[in-house]
């Protein structure tokens, strides 16, 4: 063997040993009474992969732009309909279908994310991503040309299937385009884009609806998607994938996709989400259909867990991955922080419209403080993690700021000052921005590159599930509290007329002038119940950042706090 080759082999062996020992407790030297944990960190990618094959210069700029455009599509499509729904229901005479415009999209997204994460481990990354993008665009075209409410719902469901593979695919393309130590900065760009699009969606939808047509909320996806498609086709080179072993039987090949687990997981998620969507609104919580959905969903989740244990490496989420402390801690963090973020994104515009009488566009503009805070913190954290190497401190800081800001939002009253609602939102935005992207950096730091697709899909799923579940929980809390408040404060009015016959922006049309102050106060107090749900979830993100390992993206060693 050539001496250089021998040195290289020795270095690779040393790196492997250090990686495998990252969390191994070691005894202190003789004469010391206690043991301590040494946390070893290293890049899980071979050096030659991390440097020689990464795109640079204009090519990297174009790929990063395409990834940010993808993130923009994902995020804005989630929120842009908020201000377009009144125009849609007016055209289709479909008030009863309002809930399905959002839930059909989220149901297919949440139930498909893990399956598509599995596809990324087997099939070519580029073409799997492009297929997901094409599916999303087809769904958008169906929505933009929909002649009826039913067709619009079908289009949203198809777009949701495509969306399920876009976030994890975009982050995987970034993973294979940027060295690990530089990824936090690029992750900050994608995180900032996500925040901008999520908060800009409602006012953008209002502009399209007022100036053009609600259908432009979907047409806008086509040119953005087309540009992204072309950039990825011509500039991104896929890494090698395992594909199918020719020696395997056809049954073994099919089992790589964990069909049994998938057939249990998808209906489980659909059952739980439908129960939360209908419970307390369409049906009572103790109604037979809601109870049945919760029971069936719970049983299927348990069965899915058993299948994952039996399937080993062919499981949708292999236990060897999810058992790693950083992975489950990051998933818990994303679930909780995603829940808080999406509840605020959904309910803050309603507060501005219902309590302060703002228009749809004005309510979107008044959420800009959260957007600015998000962008600033995302950019700052990306730079600092790149410099110092450690992401865990920013997860902790994100939890603290998001929790404090969310708690301050509970002080809202109809007469709250502009300085207060600007400042409180900015604090929440800073918290979300500091913490939002760090889990994606963390999983890339602690896992082998071949396991990153599954972990990335798991984190994306946790975000989506947290937001979906707790927007429904917050909606139930809001509706229940509003009914109680209206019965107590203005018994002369029928609560059903306020809840179902108009939106937050139409209170002055629905309510006689002498009762309006009491109804506005009831609206404020009820929305605080939704904010309380978000506050609890922001605090719960402490669980994730407490247990995440303190590893460095720069490959340095760090000693943990000595154990008692």
Curated annotation (Swiss-Prot):
Transmembrane segments: 66-86, 127-147, 158-178, 185-205, 216-236, 260-280, 287-307, 335-355, 368-388, 392-412, 416-436, 454-474, 528-548
Biased composition (Low complexity): 1-17
Pfam families: MFS_1 (PF07690)
Source organism per UniProt: Neocamarosporium betae
Bias type Basic and acidic residues, positions: 19-47
Protein name: Aspyridones efflux protein
Keyword Transmembrane helix: yes
Superkingdom of origin organism: Eukaryota
Disulfide bridges in this chain: none
Subcellular location: Cell membrane
CDD domains named among the record's database cross-references: MFS_Azr1_MDR_like
Record membrane topology: Multi-pass membrane protein
Carbohydrate attachment residues: 415, 524
Entries under InterPro entries matching the protein: MFS (IPR011701), MFS_dom (IPR020846), MFS_trans_sf (IPR036259)
Family, similarity comment: Belongs to the major facilitator superfamily. TCR/Tet family.
Key words, A-Z: Cell membrane, Glycoprotein, Membrane, Transmembrane, Transmembrane helix, Transport
MF (Gene Ontology): transmembrane transporter activity
GO cellular component: plasma membrane
Region called Disordered, residue ranges: 1-49
Function comment: Efflux pump that may be involved in the secretion of leporins.
UniProt key word Glycoprotein: yes
